[in-house]
């Protein structure tokens, strides 16, 4: 063996700038309107945007949900109608019917093309209707649909209160950490004070990223076990409970697609970003907590045993996927984190397609992926940015992979060609963060493999056309 062969292989990056499929970022409304309970989302776009939202979330239309579509008409585009007056009419109606704490305007491709000055209109209208208006350009010019959330959170980061601002005591209590209130529910004041003393003395820490409430509670409790207090989450359950973010605060992201929010917090609010792998899978969650502990100068405890216990509980799933290969076509920017976890589970991954890669924000995750490949003794995956789907299909045939994680556009065509697929969008909506939710990831990944094994056992994988006897 030569010295060159002994050197560890590095990650191979490539950019194809090809045609790939993903949803439109305005789909972020689907989960954000449920997360921020006192909000109202107004999507300003054409009928096409309306059809997309109606198809994606049509079941909820009849429940009068807290989102709506402001359809641009010929008069808007030809500048015959006054944008301000039209938006004022709609926002007054929203205030009258729903009275939200915040209205979020979602800009679309059309508002970009006709140069509608939403940022200029919002402050005027806000002072008139006395409701905060947040403007987010979550349009189809982004790389992936999850970046819609990134745009909204970056806009909301500007609305987070500063600690230096003069705030009345009653307002402070109201704005207090909702998670802390939930965890302390039903406890006596003495117990709460005793619990507060369990925390280490460290700089304030704020998390950013929209997660379901049970997952937020789980991650907050995991950090609490290490003596780390989470001062707040962006977004909060209510707009009125946005966390205080001041200069020198530490911030940590929970999703790989939030690079714009991270940049806003660092540049505008002078926060310090904790660059950690993301808490997806037991390995990622442990690395995430350890990195936060090291930055805040806290000694982590019990994480190795916690991770080992989770891996032991996953053994029934690991037996199904160990030694198999997975191919990511690229859709939601979760690909690198999921690939790292699945490689740790014993799979191989020849290629990770990803619509957009921010190497600075995902730097820790990429290093962790490299280390995982070295530890597991498997080849490094090729990371293809902006992949060309036609070329990817050829490479899927070449590698003869066992599973392809793909967008909905390619799932059925690949299945028809005898290739096992899993919709990548399911990982966006499933609870995949933290120690305990690793089982949910493996449930999704193994489902197509288990289904096809069951069909083979039943003898349904071969359809025989019998001669019709007339």
Swiss-Prot record:
Membrane keyword on record: no
Cofactor annotation comment: Binds 1 [4Fe-4S] cluster per heterodimer. The cluster is bound at the heterodimer interface by residues from both subunits.
Catalytic activity: chlorophyllide a + oxidized 2[4Fe-4S]-[ferredoxin] + 2 ADP + 2 phosphate = protochlorophyllide a + reduced 2[4Fe-4S]-[ferredoxin] + 2 ATP + 2 H2O
Matches recorded under Gene3D superfamilies: Nitrogenase molybdenum iron protein domain
Keywords recorded for this protein, A-Z: 4Fe-4S, ATP-binding, Chlorophyll biosynthesis, Iron, Iron-sulfur, Metal-binding, Nucleotide-binding, Oxidoreductase, Photosynthesis
Known EC number: 1.3.7.7
A GO biological process held by the record: light-independent chlorophyll biosynthetic process
Residues annotated as binding [4Fe-4S] cluster: 24, 49, 109
A single MF term (Gene Ontology): oxidoreductase activity, acting on the CH-CH group of donors, iron-sulfur protein as acceptor
Pathway(s) it belongs to: Porphyrin-containing compound metabolism; chlorophyll biosynthesis (light-independent)
Pfam families, alphabetized: Oxidored_nitro
Obligatory cofactor(s): [4Fe-4S] cluster
Role, per record: Component of the dark-operative protochlorophyllide reductase (DPOR) that uses Mg-ATP and reduced ferredoxin to reduce ring D of protochlorophyllide (Pchlide) to form chlorophyllide a (Chlide). This reaction is light-independent. The NB-protein (ChlN-ChlB) is the catalytic component of the complex.
HAMAP family: ChlN_BchN (MF_00352)
UniProt-listed NCBIfam families: DPOR_bchN, PRK02842.1
Subunit composition and interactions: Protochlorophyllide reductase is composed of three subunits; ChlL, ChlN and ChlB. Forms a heterotetramer of two ChlB and two ChlN subunits.
Family label: Belongs to the BchN/ChlN family.
Protein name: Light-independent protochlorophyllide reductase subunit N
Organism: Acaryochloris marina (strain MBIC 11017)
Gene designation: chlN
């Amino acid at each position: 063996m030569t010295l060159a062969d002994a050197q560890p292989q590095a990650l191979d990056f490539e950019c194809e700038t090809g045609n790939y499929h993903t949803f439109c970022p305005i789909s972020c409304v689907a989960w954000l309107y449920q997360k921020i309970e006192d909000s109202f989302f107004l999507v300003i776009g054409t009928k096409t945007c309306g059809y997309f939202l109606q198809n994606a979330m049509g079941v909820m239309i009849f429940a009068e949900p807290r989102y709506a579509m402001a359809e641009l008409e010929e008069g808007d585009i030809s500048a015959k109608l006054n944008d301000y007056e039209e938006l004022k009419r709609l926002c007054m109606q929203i205030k009258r019917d729903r009275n939200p704490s915040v209205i979020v305007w979602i800009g679309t491709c059309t508002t970009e093309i006709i140069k509608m000055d939403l940022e200029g209109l919002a402050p005027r209208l806000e002072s008139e209707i006395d409701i905060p208006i947040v403007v987010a350009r979550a349009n189809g010019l982004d790389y992936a649909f999850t970046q819609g959330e990134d745009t909204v959170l970056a806009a909301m980061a500007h609305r987070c209160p500063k600690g230096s601002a003069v705030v009345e005591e009653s307002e402070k209590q109201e704005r207090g950490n909702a998670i802390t209130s939930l965890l302390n529910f039903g406890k006596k004041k003495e117990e709460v004070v005793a619990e507060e003393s369990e925390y280490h003395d460290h700089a304030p820490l704020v998390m950013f990223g929209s997660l379901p409430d049970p997952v937020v509670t789980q991650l907050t409790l995991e950090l609490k076990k290490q003596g780390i207090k989470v001062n707040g989450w962006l977004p909060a359950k209510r707009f009125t409970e946005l966390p205080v973010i001041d200069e020198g605060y530490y911030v940590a992201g929970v999703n790989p697609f939030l690079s714009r929010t991270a940049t806003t917090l660092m540049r505008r609010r002078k926060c310090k970003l904790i660059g950690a792998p993301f808490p997806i899978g037991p390995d990622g969650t442990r690395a995430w907590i350890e990195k936060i502990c090291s930055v805040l100068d806290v000694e982590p405890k019990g994480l190795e045993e916690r991770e080992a216990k989770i891996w032991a509980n996953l053994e029934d799933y690991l037996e199904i996927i160990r030694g198999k290969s997975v191919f990511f076509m690229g859709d939601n920017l979760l690909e690198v984190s999921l690939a790292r976890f699945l490689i740790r589970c014993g799979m191989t991954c020849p290629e990770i397609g990803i619509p957009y890669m921010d190497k600075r924000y995902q730097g820790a995750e990429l290093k962790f992926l490299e280390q995982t490949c070295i530890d597991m003794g498997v080849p490094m995956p090729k990371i293809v940015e902006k992949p060309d789907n036609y070329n990817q299909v050829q490479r899927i045939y070449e590698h003869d992979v066992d599973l392809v994680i793909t967008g909905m556009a390619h799932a059925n065509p690949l299945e028809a060609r005898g290739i096992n697929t899993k919709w990548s969008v399911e990982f966006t909506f499933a609870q995949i963060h933290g120690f305990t939710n690793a089982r949910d990831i493996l449930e999704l990944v193994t489902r197509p493999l288990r289904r096809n094994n069951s069909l083979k056992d039943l003898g349904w994988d071969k359809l025989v056309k019998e001669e019709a006897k007339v």
